[in-house]
Amino acid sequence: MDGKPMRRCTSTRPGETGMDVTSRCTLGDPNKLPEGVPQPARMPYISDKHPRQTLEVINLLRKHRELCDVVLVVGAKKIYAHRVILSACSPYFRAMFTGELAESRQTEVVIRDIDERAMELLIDFAYTSQITVEEGNVQTSLPAACLLQLAEIQEACCEFLKRQLDPSNCLGIRAFADTHSCRELLRIADKFTQHNFQEVMESEEEFMLLPANQLIDIISSDELNVRSEEQVFNAVMAWVKYSIQERRPQLPQVLQHVRLPLLSTKFLVGTVGSDPLIKSDEECRDLVDEAKNYLLLPQERPLMQGPRTRPRKPIRCGEVLFAVGGWCSGDAISSVERYDPQTNEWRMVASMSKRRCGVGVSVLDDLLYAVGGHDGSSYLNSVERYDPKTNQWSSDVAPTSTCRTSVGVAVLGGYLYAVGGQDGVSCLNIVERYDPKENKWTRVASMSTRRLGVAVAVLGGFLYAVGGSDGTSPLNTVERYNPQENRWHTIAPMGTRRKHLGCAVYQDMIYAVGGRDDTTELSSAERYNPRTNQWSPVVAMTSRRSGVGLAVVNGQLMAVGGFDGTTYLKTIEVFDPDANTWRLYGGMNYRRLGGGVGVIKMTHCESHIW
């Protein structure tokens, strides 16, 4: 070949040569027709039946032992199969048959450490795409699926076990999940155990057989659902006395995780302090003395704060997250939706009467307030209030003294505070608060800095104003309002300048996430420790998010929506403090930038009434 395009002459009539009006001569691409010649008719066809029918035939061949090229020997059982099918379904078999292992050349392969019946079920699945997980096979099928790396079967087994969770078996399922590295099942079993602690403890058999480290994992959780710390102490002592000779030396280690300072003085002195096992151990006596000092010396309590003095915050089953307004598809929106963790669903609820972007949202007396914002053409000072029991918005709330968008809103001391924002003319440092009894807004001390796109949070009886923009550039400064003094005080700045960020209180610290600096949208996050007056970095979110909402729902920190610099987002991320990661957690019905978020506790019947 000399590199020139090949000339091809064809005739539409077999046997003819030469050129006529029906002949085609092309240079280059033999599939390309000259201009003016009609393209041949085409009809792509994809068979929906073919994959299923092919598998059915191959499965028949297997059952008749035809064209089988490998025999799996599992215990006393011989299973005939085709290497190509096994390799297509299982990375374990693919590595075995396509590599240099001895099994790649053997016609009989011995598989150890797998139950015979479980292997049969998994091979059947490879040929049929079907398996029935049930109580009688799940404990053998899951380990087998883990060995063969059949992720779908692992997920099916874990889903089955989730549905079987009960106070009488949750600890066994938890241990099973831990053994087989099923992280999601382990997490769900942990949550179930924490929420049903009293019933789990009363089931006795599994609880009493817990190893010390697992008992500590359970009772050290902030989310442990107990009426009082007495339940935790009684559970620990029952566990120790179940096998007193073996467990007596472990009592001091376990007792460290009982929050003795939260007990009543009467119970601490009369029951805990007088228990023979406690009295006979020096470390235990020290823990009791620490608790006594905390209870009897209230003026010293600020210096004695620690894990044992932190009140537990069990999961509130009825907490529901609301996403309100925002900017979507080039316009402000009035739509509102809610997320119910019980059903893991986002549902639309009644819309506001006005479209609102840059709206401030907070919850006061179990009612959701939407303050100010921008409707796409005007800045707003109007306020709406949502009642989740009736699924209705009302507009009979007094307006703020000035129009505000990109405003921060929070509740402190029974008042609704509106902080900063902009009115269309200037960036604001004005702060006012709403009294629901009087239906009236009153101005309080202004911030030292003008702030639009500011985030606010309430912690320890103070109102915090975090970041924002002064109208010229993003801010990293933070100030704190003391309602007793009616004064703002500057505190430690963030590590990053942020406007339109998300802010929430989580595990007694203020988290600030996302936003925008001088040049780009941010995925970074940081948190403020009021004890040390310091900000420290937190692992970044998976997406950049400006105009993001941040809220704590049933003990989970959730980042909602925003803008990544290219796309309006409807995705949600949840922060996992143990793994120090953010993970995606589904999405809303609407994309939302600059929407507000609020959390309301509803009774079970209220959360499903409409």
Curated annotation (Swiss-Prot):
A GO cellular component annotation in the UniProt record: Cul3-RING ubiquitin ligase complex
Keywords: Cytoplasm, Kelch repeat, Nucleus, Protein transport, Repeat, Transport, Ubl conjugation pathway
GO terms for biological process, alphabetical: Golgi to endosome transport; negative regulation of apoptotic process; proteasome-mediated ubiquitin-dependent protein catabolic process; protein K33-linked ubiquitination; protein transport; protein ubiquitination
Kelch repeats mapped onto the chain: 320-366, 368-414, 415-461, 463-508, 510-555, 557-602
Span of the signal peptide: none
UniProt keyword annotation of Transmembrane helix present: no
Residue stretches making up the BACK domain: 170-273
Localisation per UniProt entry: Cytoplasm, Perinuclear region; Nucleus
Domain BTB: 68-135
Superkingdom as given in the UniProt entry: Eukaryota
Keyword Protein transport: yes
SMART domains cross-referenced by the UniProt entry: BACK, BTB, Kelch
MF-aspect GO terms: type II interferon binding; ubiquitin-like ligase-substrate adaptor activity
Pathway this chain belongs to: Protein modification; protein ubiquitination
Region ranges (Disordered): 1-37
Oligomer status and interactors: Component of the BCR(KLHL20) E3 ubiquitin ligase complex, at least composed of CUL3, KLHL20 and RBX1.
Role of this protein: Substrate-specific adapter of a BCR (BTB-CUL3-RBX1) E3 ubiquitin-protein ligase complex involved in interferon response and anterograde Golgi to endosome transport. The BCR(KLHL20) E3 ubiquitin ligase complex mediates the ubiquitination of target proteins, leading to their degradation by the proteasome. It also specifically mediates 'Lys-33'-linked ubiquitination.
PANTHER family assigned: KELCH PROTEIN, KELCH-LIKE PROTEIN 20
Name this protein carries in UniProt: Kelch-like protein 20
